[in-house]
Amino acid sequence: FPRYDAPVYGDLISRFLRGDFGSNESVHPQLVALLFAEDRHGAAPEMKKTLTEGGTVLLDRYVYSNIAYQCAKVADSEEAEKLRDWIFNTEYGNFALPVPDLNIFLDVPIGFVESRLKSQRGGEDRDYLEGGQDIHEADIEFQKRVRDIYRKQCELDPKFIRIDCSDEYGEMLPPGAIFAKVKEVV
């Protein structure tokens, strides 16, 4: 998630991330959270069908992503907690999305994140930007707040596992080493 090619919400999410509705700070995080939640809500029947048939659903960015990215926009910790609870209630309660057995946060060195965000990237997964920049990716300080929220969620939820993707020098581990760590918790 998000599914940029999904009707209605995929288009709205793409437009938001391009900045068509304003800056990251100017669009209320609860409204943005609802866009991402509705995208998952639209995919819920397919996920539930797969699970009912005994299959496995493996997702990149789910409910905790919504919490991290939207709560990072809220300076007041009490308000951020209210937003967190609202997102949980909306996605798992009102929309009845499947609750994961396990969440994994791949905690990468912030220097690696910064260098990746500054580099020119392309590919089909970037088509939604139409040559522009993702407003969530434009601000490294925002990315640091997102990371902090992910880390906090790992402390609060025993089903949310943090995997440190850095070596003893703070550099990014090679993919094989990260995969080995993932296999240990799965």
Predicted segment positions?
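ATP-dependent small-molecule kinase phosphotransfer cores
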Residues: 1-95
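Structural signal for conserved beta-strand scaffold positions within catalytic alpha/beta enzyme cores
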Residues: 2, 105, 162-164
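Short beta->alpha linker loops
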Residues: 4, 62, 108, 166-167
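Generic alpha-helical secondary structure signal
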Residues: 8-15, 108, 112, 145
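Conserved phosphate-donor/acceptor-positioning beta-strand/loop module used by diverse small-molecule
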Residues: 59-62, 87, 96-118
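NTP-dependent small-molecule kinase module
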Residues: 111-186
